[in-house]
Amino acid sequence: MNKIKFLDKTLVQKIAAGEAIDRPCSILRELLDNAIDSGADKIEVFIEEGGIRRILITDNGSGISKEDLKICYLPHTTSKINEEKDLERIQTLGFRGEALSSIAICSNLMITSSTTGENSYQIEIENGIEKYFKKQSAINGTMVDVTNLFHNFPARKRFLKKDSIETKMCLKVFEEKAVTHPGIDFKLSVNKELKKVYFKESLADRVQSVYGEIIENNKFGKIEAEYDHVKMKIFFAPPNFSRKDRRNIKIFVNRRPIEEKSLSESIINGHSRILTYKNFPVCYLFLEIDTTHVDFNIHPQKKEVRFFNLPFLPKQISNNINEFFDREKQEILQDYHNVIIKRQLTNDAHLLHPENDLTNSNFKTYEITQDEALILDKPKNNKVTNIIEDKVKFEGQIPQKYKPSFKQHIQKIFIKTSKMPNNFQKSTQTNEFKYMGQLFSEFLIVENANEIYFIDQHALHEKIIYQTLINSEKTIQKLLVPIEFQVECEDTDKILTSELEEYKKIDIIVKKIQNQTYRLESIPNICNKYENIIIQFFKTRKSKIIDSLETELYATLACRQAIKCNDTISLEFSQFLINEFFNLKLKHCPHGRKIYHKITKFELEKSVNRQ
């Protein structure tokens, strides 16, 4: 007796439907694709009970003729492709001819449609079988009404989430379609309540309309680029709106949302200079790619894609984002006046190493004034009290001579303190800013017009040092004794091997000796004594872009040398930090953290019911 049998036609259709339609949002996606492909410029969506009870979509597109309406719900019927070659140049969102047949087999489906100048016709299908076909009062376009989803798929229905969760999934699909088609009016109603309305607008405005709430209606940054076969637009949020997961990294290829790890990683890499580890950007990537260089016929829901002859794409995305932030940084730094600082850091690069014995250096011992003593590490018997009655009061003993550590030398590089009078005002005017004092030995309080700034002293000092380091001139320095090291991960080995030439651009010479074994031969002069940091970076390489090494290294140096929390600092040094903060318009430390928090007078008064 034969064990292999032909499956019943209805069973085959149910299996196929289960692949294409897994929940209400899948139906919404397919029906929106059809409405968009019809040329509609107005689409309305109605959802009830998460789409399980009902999904109704109306559009003003080209409509479906009487003859086509009779067969449109049958398996593998489509108007979008005719032959095999059409799969190589897909111009529409749908093309397989599976959507309506899959929907019809797992729900009650009613379609009403008309073409221009013709009568409307209506067809109802239940469990994949036509229930009736009749003439209907005229409408403009098409109306698709799906009810009782999975009523004949009890197993599938049991795995659906609560109505509220299914509604959120439908909303996500609706937003993805709306943001990729800004030339269409979209409306969404949930349980008879109007939820979303988007009118025709530019892509930039549509991104702002759909996703602006995520960044509290701040403006997205924008990048546009064009290459052979590819047009690229990138919209990204300010760094302080970063997230702890990747959910707000969205990629659209030819107006389809896709899941592509290499492109997602390239976006993360592009933000690696400004975001801390495990913080992810809010970013939306739109790619328009020649249809001969992309294949969507992979995933049942078209979530995956293959690219042909576009190896440059991931790296170009990273580079574009990096260049954007570099340009932004240069605009800020063009007013950077402290050229002497950069020259001194360049000439005395060896001083960037705490391992150096400064006793044997060319630096002399320093006479310590009261204000300088506040910058230095305080001996145990030195006590400094808070500002009291508009005066600084010192208690205990201050050493008269002190040999500065590397940390203090860095501070002297950034500000030359002078003798401070015994008495000074509690609130000291700095240009148009008023310095109010230090809070918790961690924050600088500054009044500016009708605003109060709480500035993180460590983050601010770190950013100032970092900008000086990153912009100082560097030369390549050959190691007297090259260092050999091994990487354990094969993926890391492949990455390093492919990027050896790229490292030379940042003055790092590393050569591969054998499989997973390398030799570090040269580094930038400013990185002397920090070979271990570079090697550790090599060993932990995953997919970061090459120039993140420079950024990460100097960010680490700056972090180590900046003043810390619980460091009490002088009035002059505080003034210096505040002036740099406002002059350079600094917002984030090299690791992406906010440097300050601001409260307006209005907000403060409102908090105590003064408004």
Swiss-Prot record:
Family matches, as Pfam families: DNA_mis_repair (PF01119), HATPase_c_3 (PF13589), MutL_C (PF08676)
An example Gene Ontology molecular-function term: mismatched DNA binding
Cellular component annotations (GO), alphabetically ordered: mismatch repair complex
Gene3D superfamilies recorded: 3.30.230.10, Histidine kinase-like ATPase, C-terminal domain, MutL, C-terminal domain, dimerisation subdomain, MutL, C-terminal domain, regulatory subdomain
GO biological process, one term: mismatch repair
Keywords: DNA damage, DNA repair
Transmembrane segments: none
CDD domains noted in UniProt: HATPase_MutL-MLH-PMS-like, MutL_Trans
PROSITE patterns assigned: DNA_MISMATCH_REPAIR_1
PANTHER family: DNA MISMATCH REPAIR PROTEIN MLH, PMS, MUTL, DNA MISMATCH REPAIR PROTEIN MLH1
Family: Belongs to the DNA mismatch repair MutL/HexB family.
Function text: This protein is involved in the repair of mismatches in DNA. It is required for dam-dependent methyl-directed DNA mismatch repair. May act as a 'molecular matchmaker', a protein that promotes the formation of a stable complex between two or more DNA-binding proteins in an ATP-dependent manner without itself being part of a final effector complex.
Protein name, UniProt field: DNA mismatch repair protein MutL
Gene: mutL
